[in-house]
């Protein structure tokens, strides 16, 4: 396991009903293929040695003995292979015939797992031939030259490097209390399901929903293999399904109704799954003293004797990585944007009602953040059936304000029908510079922050005067980087954008531009989207254009949002985030969709390293600003509220994170 990833496979081999030699040879071909591709664990369909649809032939001693001999052949074949293989076969235990999954590696049987729930309804008659694991008592059987312990309890298999997995069989996952529930609560990271599920109209969609839900509920990687072409079509059809999920997300799936053997392979992020479990107190509380067996503690998986550092250098991530993890997929974009707006406006509406505020006061700069906050205010007032004139938009031109942003601010406020106030900060800030002895020609941090704090003072005093509340405009990305003036734009009475990352804000504003405003507002919003991000605290250039561009100073927001997502959501270390970023922004086979025309066409490794180090350094250094944030609604899975999702001491030391980032 490297960077927390393990490579798994689900195979659908060719099958002939009752021909154990042919079936075993087909399984061997798939195992060899998986070994060559670096797969660490592969699973096959239910009763894959014999074929599932043997029916009363399972009562024939000839078939049962031949099946056992075929497993011995398979053991011999795998003697020098590292891949762990899970195959299906009938196993006799005393007077019981069990439908089992057999886990093998290096020519050894690591364990045998009997099926718990036997379907005996409609087209299924498994109880005619097989007994349930619930009928079994702990015992030891001799099978395929091995002494193997059988138990009705769930069994956990543990690889050499600590990955834990369990096995369930077909109907088990359809039951009200699947064995995978107990397996996951006992520590299984992965669940392998050997299945023989026939095709019925609508069943495939239901199956995928079921597996996705089970993977999400148990926070596991779920690897499913169901038999296909070659099984008997006497009464039903087996279309073949190989599916791999990670915490509810479909990573890979086979072609349906294929007449050829198939295999799907994916890398599952076990580290991410474990992070999800650790942070989910409900999951932890559900864990009980479950009776289970831990098997295979001494067996190895691929490359376990190699130098770990060498392994990580050789590691290649084969799955795609979304460069914009905060942004909804195109098919869900409109619905997701609408949902986000509703969360924001409901949070603000409740605060307005609770405080009996007559007005809300918001600074309008003509930039993205204040635009989104204003749109939320408008929607909240409409929801509460309040007059939009109760929204007081204040534009406060300063030394760096450009005509473009000023005109956009005025135009947007006019078209939305709110109250407009214009208060220049130039005179007040100039007087302040004289009072504190600041040279106005020195454009340092004091020069910049004085302007931000003057604007906040104006907004706060206006809110007091008008019986209103100041609406904060700062976003999640700025909070992560500390790109806000302490007690300046950092402070408000309610921050509606506090958990919205910068990359998502463009899409939210664009959603409104396309669907929720008049033509003049639409034109203005589109120009705001195309405007470079800037606090405009430094005078414009000689042509009157924005000179101070945020992303030139702290780095591209699409990179920082990527870093933030994996750092905060899963607690990944810098080396893993860097590896994922390279895949997402450099090595991806997918066409990259730029968030903005201002984004670079591409990134190189040094650029990613540079801004990753900046992110780590600023994230730690700027925690003191996040420790005293105003209230604001949580919207997504990542938030920096000190009262909820992120509690970190302001004087924490970043040394170990920075050291790893420096060594990339």
Language model features: what each stretch is:
Residues 6-7, 23, 161, 218-220, ...:
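ATP/NTP-dependent adenylation/nucleotidyl-transfer catalytic domains that generate, transfer
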Residues 1-361, 379-388, 420:
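Enzyme catalytic cores with a strong preference for nitrogen-chemistry domains
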């Amino acid at each position: 396991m490297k960077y927390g990833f393990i490579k798994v496979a689900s195979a659908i081999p060719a099958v002939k009903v009752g021909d154990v030699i042919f079936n075993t040879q087909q399984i061997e071909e798939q195992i060899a293929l998986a070994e060559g591709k670096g797969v660490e664990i592969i699973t096959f369909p239910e009763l894959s040695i014999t074929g599932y649809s043997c029916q009363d032939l399972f009562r024939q001693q000839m078939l049962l003995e031949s099946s056992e001999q075929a497993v011995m052949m398979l053991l011999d074949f795998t003697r020098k292979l590292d891949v762990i293989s899970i195959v299906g076969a009938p196993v006799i235990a005393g007077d019981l015939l069990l439908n089992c999954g057999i886990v093998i590696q290096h020519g050894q049987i690591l364990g045998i797992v009997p099926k718990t729930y036997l379907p005996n309804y409609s087209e299924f008659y498994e109880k005619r031939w097989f007994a349930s694991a619930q009928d079994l008592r702990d015992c030891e059987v001799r099978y395929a030259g091995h002494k193997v312990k059988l138990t009705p309890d769930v069994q956990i298999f543990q690889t050499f490097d600590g990955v834990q997995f369990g096995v369930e069989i077909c109907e088990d996952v359809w039951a009200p209390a699947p064995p995978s529930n107990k397996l996951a609560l006992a520590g299984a990271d992965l669940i392998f399901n050997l299945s023989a599920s026939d095709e019925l109209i609508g069943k495939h969609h239901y199956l995928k929903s079921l597996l996705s839900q089970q993977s999400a509920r148990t926070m596991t990687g779920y690897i499913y293999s169901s038999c296909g072409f070659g099984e008997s079509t006497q009464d039903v059809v087996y279309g073949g399904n190989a599916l791999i999920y990670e915490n509810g997300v479909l990573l890979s799936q086979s072609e349906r109704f294929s007449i050829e053997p198939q295999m799907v392979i994916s890398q599952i992020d076990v580290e991410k799954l474990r992070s999800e479990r650790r942070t989910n107190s409900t999951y932890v509380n559900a864990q009980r003293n479950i009776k289970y067996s831990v098997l295979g503690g001494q067996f190895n998986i691929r490359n376990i004797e190699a130098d770990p550092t060498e392994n990580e250098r050789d590691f290649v991530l084969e799955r795609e990585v979304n460069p914009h993890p905060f942004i909804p997929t195109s098919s869900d974009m409109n619905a997701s944007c609408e949902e986000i707006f509703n969360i924001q406006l409901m949070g603000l509406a409740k605060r307005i009602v609770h405080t009996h505020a007559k007005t809300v006061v918001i600074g309008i700069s003509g930039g993205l953040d204040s635009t989104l906050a204003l749109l939320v205010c408008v929607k909240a007032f409409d929801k509460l059936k309040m007059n939009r004139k109760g929204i007081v938009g204040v534009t406060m031109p300063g030394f760096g304000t450009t005509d473009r942003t000023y005109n956009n601010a005025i135009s947007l406020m006019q078209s939305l029908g709110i109250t407009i106030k214009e208060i220049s900060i130039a005179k007040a800030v100039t007087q302040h510079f004289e009072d504190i002895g600041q040279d106005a020609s020195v454009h340092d941090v004091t020069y910049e922050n004085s302007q931000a704090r003057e604007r906040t003072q104006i907004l706060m005093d206006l809110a007091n005067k008008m019986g209103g509340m100041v609406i904060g405009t700062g976003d999640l990305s700025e909070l992560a980087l500390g790109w806000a003036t302490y007690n300046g734009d950092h402070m408000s009475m309610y921050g509606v954008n506090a958990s919205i990352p910068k990359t998502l804000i463009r899409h939210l504003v664009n959603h409104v531009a396309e669907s929720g405003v008049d033509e003049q507002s639409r034109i203005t919003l589109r120009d705001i989207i195309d405007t470079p991000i800037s606090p405009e605290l430094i005078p414009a250039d000689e042509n009157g254009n924005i000179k101070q561009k945020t992303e030139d100073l702290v780095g591209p927001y699409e990179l920082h949002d990527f870093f933030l997502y994996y750092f905060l959501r899963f607690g990944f270390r810098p080396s893993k985030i860097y590896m994922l970023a390279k895949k997402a922004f450099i090595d991806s086979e997918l066409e990259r969709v730029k968030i903005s025309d201002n984004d670079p066409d591409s990134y190189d490794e040094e650029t990613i390293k540079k801004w990753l180090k900046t992110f780590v350094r600023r994230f730690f250094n700027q925690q003191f600003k996040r420790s005293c944030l105003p209230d604001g609604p949580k919207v997504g899975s990542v938030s920096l509220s000190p009262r909820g999702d992120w509690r970190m001491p302001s004087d924490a030391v970043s040394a170990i994170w920075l050291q790893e980032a420096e060594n990339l």
